[in-house]
Amino acid sequence: IHTTAQMQVVLVKPDRFDNVSDIAEHLRSKHAVVLNLEATNKDVARRLVDFLSGCAYALDGKIKKIAISTYIITPYNVDIVGDLIDELENSGLYL
């Protein structure tokens, strides 16, 4: 019997820090999370990124800034690859 686990990507656009526990739960469930902070207050956005960076670290995951105010947080079993990611890392513009 062949079974394939389906990876899920969750898109979130939090407006307050209270949303962080739901986002952390997605990470604990091994879902990748795209975090859009465009409409989030700067102080709240910083707290969210700090907390979720800690969650990613504790779960052996990764967090990468992929655009202005947008991050991707992945579980340990997901690699982030691609020309855009390499370009962003090499230029130092976003990471």
Model-predicted regions and their roles:
Residues I1-V33, Y57, K62-L95:
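Positively charged, small/polar-rich N-terminal and surface patches that mediate targeting and assembly
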Residues F17-V20, K42-R46:
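Loop/helix-junction capping segments adjacent to catalytic residues or to phosphate/diphosphate-binding pockets
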Residues V44-D50, C55-K62:
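Feature captures the catalytic cores and cofactor-binding loops of soluble hydro-lyases/lyases
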